[in-house]
C-alpha cells in the first residue's frame, strides 16, 4: 500500500511543459516561470520561428540602413532586367533610411526627400517592382491607384485615403506611418485632358494632381481614425507627410510620339520635309524624356517639380520574357509546376515552348503581364483532365502545344501501362 501512495505523490510532484504537455522526465530541461513551465524543445521551436521571420524580411540591415547593393540583390531574385530602375529605387530607399536616421541625430541641415517617377511601357514591371519592394523593406509601405482618386467633395476617393492606407499598414502607429513609402500607380491616367487649361472642371485629372501636390511636398493630413467618410464631429489623426517618400508609376501611352516629334516644325506643300517614322522601341524613346514632354502629355509643371527623379524602364524582349517565365523565385513556370506537383505529376517545358510563349506576349503587346493568360490557355485542358486520369507521371509542353498544333505529351508510369495491358 505504501508503494501506491509513493507513486501517487510522485505523479503529483511531476512537472509538465505548459505548451507541449511533456513531463520533466521526457525533456532535457524544464524552465519555470511564475505560473507556467516551458521545456527546451519548445524554446528551440520558438527560436526557429523567430529566425525564419528574420530571414523572410529579405534585406540585411547594417547599422539600421540597408545598402543599395543589399536592396538590389533582393530585387534581382524576383525581377528580371530593368537594372537602371532597380538602381534608382534602391538608392532612393537607402537615402530614405539615411534621411530618417539623420533627422533623429541632428537638426543642423535639413535633408529634403526626392520623390520618384517610373515611366515605362505596359507590362515592363513598374508595379511588380513596387510590390517586391514592399516585401523587403521594414518601413510601412502602401500602394494606391490614381484612377480611383478624385478631388475632395466628389464621388471617389480623396487623396487623404492614400495616407489612411499607409496608416493601416503601420497598424495606426502615426510615427511609423510618417516614415513610410507610398507607391501611386497609373499616375498617367490623371493627366490633364487637354494641353491647355480647360474652363470646365477636371475632377479626376488636373484636380487630382493639384490635390496631390501638398501631400507629396509635405503637409499635415487629417485622416479619419478608422477610415470611412469624414464627419464634422469626428476626431482626426494628424499625419505629417514631410518624410513620406512618394514613388509614382505609369505607362504614359502616346508619350513616345510627343518625344519623337519634339522640335518638329509642321509644313505643307511639295517642299515639305518628310520624316521617316521613329522605329525605335518605346523603352528606347523614353530615354530621351524631358520634363517638357510630360507637361505636353498633361502633367502640370508643379506636379512634375515634386518628382525630381525620373527613371525610365525598357521594353522586355524575348530573352527577358523567357527568363521571367523560369528564373525568379516565384516564376510562372515554378508556380504551375507546384500546382501539378499537388497531383503528383511533373510538368516540363521545352525551351522552344518558352520562346513561343514569350513571342506571343510580345505580339499581344502586353509584356510580362500577358504571360499568365497565355499559360492558362495552354494548360487549361490539361488541368481539367489531370485529376480524373490515373498513372500520369509527367506532362511535357512543346512549342507545337503553344501554337495549338499539338496536345501536351502525357507520360504514364509503368504500373498504369501494365494495368491497361491487363484490362485489354
From Swiss-Prot:
Residues binding ATP: 121-128
Pfam families per the UniProt record, alphabetical: AAA_2 (PF07724), ClpB_D2-small (PF10431), zf-C4_ClpX (PF06689)
Gene Ontology annotations of biological process type: cell division; proteolysis involved in protein catabolic process
Keyword Phosphoprotein: no
Residues annotated to bind Zn(2+): 17, 20, 39, 42
One term under GO cellular component: HslUV protease complex
ClpX-type ZB domain: residues covered: 5-58
This protein's UniProt keywords: ATP-binding, Chaperone, Metal-binding, Nucleotide-binding, Zinc
Record GO terms (molecular function): ATP binding; ATP hydrolysis activity; ATP-dependent protein folding chaperone; protein dimerization activity; unfolded protein binding; zinc ion binding
Quaternary assembly: Component of the ClpX-ClpP complex. Forms a hexameric ring that, in the presence of ATP, binds to fourteen ClpP subunits assembled into a disk-like structure with a central cavity, resembling the structure of eukaryotic proteasomes.
Similarity comment: family membership: Belongs to the ClpX chaperone family.
Protein role: ATP-dependent specificity component of the Clp protease. It directs the protease to specific substrates. Can perform chaperone functions in the absence of ClpP.
Protein name as annotated: ATP-dependent Clp protease ATP-binding subunit ClpX
The species this protein was found in: Bartonella tribocorum (strain CIP 105476 / IBS 506)
The encoding gene: clpX
